[in-house]
């Protein structure tokens, strides 16, 4: 089964986070690469006992949180994985959790739809420094794009232009770093696994360079990180000008970054036309690096393929004051009024009440579905 971090809370005020996974105890290696299977030197010695798997119970911080991030430090004796999300989303989550002594359901609603990018705030100083060093060379469009970034707060709103410049810079930067060494086929496969390329980019940025920086297609020249940043920025302005028009102020992120809700049978065009199975594209805020994750593959940029499949806020003091919203609806039947009827609410950050008591469930039910054995 897929490994999970399970968050826990109960009516007595206890909270916890438990890693639920079969973590192998390896004689040798970390499971990342292909190894000889016939020598016995890479065998497993068993599974880490449940009591020794990472957990947190009633921590002194008063909160537990998880965003696909690494939950152990270097002292943890067992190797779990390299397959973690970068720290930016969990950093922002913890910043918001610590911002108030007491949090309300409305605060958690705002957290669910938070588009502030800690990654953008981390990358911007270095990016702006390089562009500023070339300020005498800037075209009018480049100067306008620079101004968008310079005055930006780092919030990935769909109606703003700066997010389009920033994320397109990131996507183009990944290509300019790796494509010359990898070529088309390997680069496509590499960027399908977004965690790998994101970790590599983060390390290169923080170390101010690395073996991938030099463009091997420019013979006799060894590029620095600053060279690649400058070339990438020029590429971005030229490319967005072709995609979204000549005026950088009109480069709204939601024109580039979209969400389409696709039915499993919606790929059959005649069925989609007749039954209106697919919906969208909708302009999408956020990104893979925001707490509200409208994420996309670097191999197919800006087409949202990952996000919150449900948003829940549970009130353990009064279960009937809990909240929920889905990106689609409670029915998979296109003829149902409950097919994709929550999408607009989901995109706006709105919620429905989520009832648990028998009386409230019966009172608010639209209909009752009874499944009977025919025998």
Regions found by a protein language model. Give the residues of each.
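C-terminal/peripheral segments of proteins
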Residues: 1-134, 138, 147, 151-375
């Amino acid at each position: 089964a897929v490994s999970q971090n399970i968050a826990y809370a109960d009516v007595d005020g206890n909270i916890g986070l438990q890693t639920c996974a079969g973590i192998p105890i390896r004689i040798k290696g970390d499971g990342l690469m292909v190894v000889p299977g016939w020598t016995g030197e890479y065998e497993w010695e068993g599974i880490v006992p449940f009591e020794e798997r990472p957990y947190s119970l009633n921590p002194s911080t008063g909160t537990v949180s998880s965003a696909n991030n690494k939950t152990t430090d270097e002292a943890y004796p067992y190797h779990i994985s390299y397959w973690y999300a970068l720290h930016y989303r969990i950093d922002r989550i913890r910043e918001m959790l610590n911002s108030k002594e007491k949090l309300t359901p409305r605060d958690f609603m705002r957290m669910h739809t938070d588009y502030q990018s800690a990654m953008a705030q981390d990358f911007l100083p270095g990016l702006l420094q390089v562009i500023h060093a070339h300020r005498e060379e800037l075209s009018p469009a480049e100067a306008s794009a620079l101004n968008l970034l310079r005055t930006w707060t780092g919030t990935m709103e769909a109606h703003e232009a700066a997010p389009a410049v920033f994320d397109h810079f990131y996507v183009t930067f990944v290509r300019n770093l790796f494509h010359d060494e990898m070529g088309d086929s390997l680069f496509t496969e590499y960027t399908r696994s977004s965690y790998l390329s994101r970790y590599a980019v983060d390390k290169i940025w923080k170390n101010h360079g690395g073996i991938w920086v030099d463009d091997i297609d420019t013979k006799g020249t060894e590029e620095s990180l600053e060279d690649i940043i400058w070339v990438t920025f020029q590429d971005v302005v030229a490319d967005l000008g072709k995609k979204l028009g000549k005026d950088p102020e009109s480069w709204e992120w939601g024109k580039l970054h979209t969400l389409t809700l696709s039915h499993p049978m919606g790929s059959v065009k005649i069925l989609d036309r007749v039954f209106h199975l697919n919906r969208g594209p909708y302009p999408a805020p956020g990104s893979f690096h925001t707490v509200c994750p409208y994420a996309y593959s670097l191999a197919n940029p800006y087409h949202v393929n990952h996000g919150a499949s449900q948003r829940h806020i549970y009130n353990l003091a009064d279960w009937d004051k809990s909240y929920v919203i889905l990106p689609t609806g409670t029915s998979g039947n296109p003829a149902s009024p409950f097919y994709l009827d929550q999408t607009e609410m989901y995109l706006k950050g709105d919620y429905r009440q989520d009832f648990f008591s028998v009386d409230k469930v019966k009172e608010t039910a639209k209909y009752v579905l009874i499944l009977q054995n025919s025998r």
